[in-house]
Amino acid sequence: ADKAAVDSMRSELNNLEMKGQIVIGEGELDEAPMLYIGEKLGTNNGPEFDIAVDPLEGTNFAANNLPGALSVIAVAEKNSLFNAPETYMEKISTKITEKNVIDLDYTVKQNISNLSDYLNKKPEELTACILDRPRHKEIIEELKKLKVNLKLITDGDVSGALLVTDEKYNVDIFLGIGGGPEGVLAASALDAFNCNFQCRFLFKTEKDKERAKKI
């Protein structure tokens, strides 16, 4: 499924009148044969663009014929998309754009309290979306203590962040730790929806720090 998505996306991008370059893709040149970081795409005529892609987010969804898989592309002017390294990021997304309501520096309890006050909802009327991962155990336990409704997702770092964009999804906040490249893709989409997305790197090892310094 992933190969089919890569092949199709690359073929279509190469048909566009542009000078495109992958800044977030399937990996470095030695890691991926196509849609690798630095690969040139397009007809080599027209405007210059940075391109960030995730040809298939939610591979397991697609493989099992389940809803939730996405093909994600962000295109922007040259030198305007951040080439995020393959490291973890702390993330929060909401529809609230006012300052000092939701912040990565706040505790989960403080963010939920602020969200509750701002939306005029009780904590038990709020819904938080988070990836169902062992690394989120403490956050999930805290949300349960606060009686916040949980939407646990098995995959979909980008799609999870986008659930705050429309009331039909009934998600007030997305939070947790996910991939850096996925953070850039989510930020690009959420900006178009005039939503609030905050992220910062969470380096687990010295190797992660060194990788980030090279970007």
Where are these regions (language model features)?
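General beta-strand structural signal in soluble alpha/beta enzymes
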Residues: 22-26, 51-53, 62-64, 83-84, ...
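DPxDG-like acidic metal-binding loop motif
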Residues: 46-57, 61-82
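N-terminal subdomain of lithium-sensitive/metallo-dependent phosphomonoesterases centered on the IMPase/IPPase/PAP
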Residues: 1-52, 110-113, 117, 144, ...
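Solvent-exposed alpha-helices and their adjacent loops that cap or buttress functional pockets
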Residues: 14-15, 40-46, 54, 62-66, ...
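Oxyanion/phosphate-interacting regions
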Residues: 163-215
